[in-house]
Amino acid sequence: MYTDFSKLRNIGISAHIDSGKTTLTERILFYTKRIHAIHEVKGKDGVGATMDSMELERERGITIASAATHCEWKGLHLNIIDTPGHVDFTIEVERSLRVLDGAILVLCSVAGVQSQSLTVDRQMRRYNVPRLAFVNKCDRSGANPIRVKDQLREKLQHNPVLMQLPIGLEDKFEGVVDLVKMKAFRFSGDDGEVITESEIPADMQADAARAREELLDAASMFSDELTDAILEDRVTEELIKAAVRKGTLALKLTPVFMGSAYKNKAVQKLLDGVVDYLPDPTEVVNEAHDLTKDEEKVALTIDNEKPTVALAFKLEDGRYGQLTYLRIYQGKLSRDMFITNMRTKKDHRIGRLVRMHSDQMEDIDAAGSGDIVAMFGVDCNSGDTFTDGTVKLNMTSMHVPEPVIALSIKPVDSKSETNMGKALRRFTREDPTFRAGLDEESGETIIRGMGELHLEVYIERMKREYNCIVEVSPPQVAYRETVSQRADFAYTHKKQTGGSGQFGRVCGYIEPCEQQFEFVDDVVGGAIPREFISAVEKGFRSMLAKGRLLGFPVVNTRVVINDGASHAVDSSDIAFQEAARGAWREGFDRAKPRLLEPIMRVVCEGPAEFSGGILGTLMQRRAMIIGSQDDGGLARIEAEVPLAEMFGYSTTLRSATQGKAEFSMEFSRYLPVPAAMAEELMTKASKKAEGGKK
């Protein structure tokens, strides 16, 4: 268990596909003596990279599932967390990024800043993750790390500063000039483990002096002490490092390193950069919501003696049951300790606590604040917060957005049917924005989520991880129904069946409101006896699940009851529930009901020369443009678009921009469906219903 938190780093490694992320991780593990032989992603030895533990990953040479590992470098403990590959819709992304304190953004020296680099960087910016850039593949034909540094400024709006210059490029790449030490470093030996320090080559001294001056200019913006030292010509390595670190942690500076992971060059210098410039857990602000004070935010302290607060950020089906990855934000965890799940309020005993190394694990007795570990034997969901029971804090707000899109899926055979149940159970535990259930009328399995891509990812995972193949129906939009004006109702439910009958009368009105549903009891004089008021409310609430237009849930509706009647013998809970249902039907039909559709906030980003084409694709889809901007050749267009118009949009956008633009989409609000479209939807629904009756 760590007590010197300055010696701890929690970092992520993110990149566009094929930028060399897994190869870089493999080298980091080798140089930190975590592994004792290097295996390539698509190596001839057939072993495959350490971090690619799934068979499918090793066959294809890509990383599918995320992995976590840890290693030591120069007395520091590094936890390396793989950031998720799909960064669009799931809550899991937010959790994974919350777990990181800093990150390495890997860029290809030839291709530079690519579309996925933009996406990854945007996510990190959203969660305030300080980062270093590593320009990889300097040995490749066409390598130009200086151009990539410029792209960081132009395309990502970073303030990049070179920490190194390359010694040679392409097949002549030998090493780097360290602009802080003003020394040359070359890497030799079978695996680049022999580092030779020497003077800067004569033909590079002028370039190195110029680049160091730029480094000092950029760093001095964050340190008056460094500014004074520059003027007095007494600059030290420590002053430069302290200033660059300050700028990096403030997200105002991006130190740029370079090398070739595949050719084993300069990875050790990047590790030095992680130590020097990325934050330890005490330098990052983490907050929790106090459940005793209406989810008020409270700051957490990296302190092993404080009450324990930990977040389950990833679940895996391990060989010994569910494996839960945890980040400890405050306090400590130990084996056999009892912890409380803040969502379920249940206590659990930690049966086994481990450190992960890809798919291998090492048992430990305890872990402290700021650390990342995994536990077995605790039943939980991804995103659950655990405490030691002395505090009621939650790491994430309890609010989970409602799904906006649904698909019906059907397994192709009995084997797929068995596996589908297992897959859906696991996915709904991992991701609260993903829902699955049975449609009572059709008997079909319906999955719901935050967008097309969100559901596509899970259908693909079913196939890959559970060998479950399903047929997918066209997507369905999660419409809602509401009323648009006030309407009165006065309904009497009367039933005589011999013996005691049923009687209940309910009067009042229905009207639009801001809340999902509001029930107001304005009955005076005992017209409806008090003991039946809750039955009346229950009757009204039972009608909310299915509206009377197309059977979608009803929202933004207030029901006020102000009169009624009862019978001494025939009135009962059941009678008043039925009276309320009849009153609802009467009032709802008179209150001009209408359909609401989900409106998505869509952000499109691509080269400025395609901005006209991007606008065109949006305007064809009933979009309302909110704003557009052009940042250094990168156009960003923000719009609100009905979800019903967004199906297949990725293909349209790709063809309109030669595949150079991308978009993200999130739910914004519900708005009324235009009258003509609502009419069309209802006509389709009635035809479908008639077809079903035949």
From Swiss-Prot:
Q: Which InterPro entries match?
A: EFG_II (IPR041095), EFG_III (IPR009022), EFG_III/V (IPR035647), EFG_IV (IPR047872), EFG_V-like (IPR000640), EFTu-like_2 (IPR004161), G_TR_CS (IPR031157), P-loop_NTPase (IPR027417)
Where would you say this protein principally sits, based on its record? cytoplasm
Superkingdom of the organism of origin: Bacteria
Q: Where is the signal peptide?
A: none
Q: Where in the cell is it found?
A: Cytoplasm
Residues annotated as transmembrane: none
What this protein is reported to do is described as:
Catalyzes the GTP-dependent ribosomal translocation step during translation elongation. During this step, the ribosome changes from the pre-translocational (PRE) to the post-translocational (POST) state as the newly formed A-site-bound peptidyl-tRNA and P-site-bound deacylated tRNA move to the P and E sites, respectively. Catalyzes the coordinated movement of the two tRNA molecules, the mRNA and conformational changes in the ribosome.
What does the similarity note say?
Belongs to the TRAFAC class translation factor GTPase superfamily. Classic translation factor GTPase family. EF-G/EF-2 subfamily.
PANTHER family under this entry? Answer: ELONGATION FACTOR G, MITOCHONDRIAL
Q: What is this protein called?
A: Elongation factor G 2
Gene for this chain: fusA2
